[in-house]
Amino acid sequence: MSITLRPADRCRYDIVSLGEVMLRLDPRERRIRTAKSFDVWEGGGEYNVGRGLSRVFGKRAAVITGLVDDPVGHLVGDLITAGGVDDQFITWVPSDGVGRTVRTGLNFTERGFGVRGAVGVSDRGLSLIHI
């Protein structure tokens, strides 16, 4: 078996990532348990690589993922676009309106400070990655 790669100048993208993109909720300097508000970001292991290469090195990036066709899913989609990643390969999945069939995964991340390490809590129940 052999793999033939096209030259870079004949490719539309430098990197295409495949995986779940979640809504990341950041309580800034606070703990998740005591936070009264959160900053929102998009994130996912594979996606973060493409976004980083796009933002830092100007690489052409796209993501293959699925998002729920509701306000939270569209927020994540807008954040993907603002992050410089092409969103044309997003599959939009209908929502039941209450999250009983499918919903956008959530990730809460506390920043680490000094000796306090970062803490992450994911809520991925019924997210697209599990269906």
Each model region followed by its residue ranges:
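Positively charged, low-complexity intrinsically disordered leader regions
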Residues: 1-33
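Short secondary-structure capping/turn segments at boundaries of alpha-helices and beta-strands
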Residues: 4-5, 49-50, 94, 107
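Gly/Ser/Thr-rich helix-start
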Residues: 20, 44-46, 67
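Short pre-catalytic strand/loop immediately N-terminal to key active-site residues, enriched for Gly-Thr
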Residues: 34-43
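Alpha-helix C-terminal capping segments
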Residues: 41, 48-60, 82
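Generic non-transmembrane alpha-helix signal with a bias for helix starts/N-cap capping motifs
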Residues: 46-47, 73
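Conserved N-terminal subdomain of the carbohydrate kinase-like
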Residues: 60-129
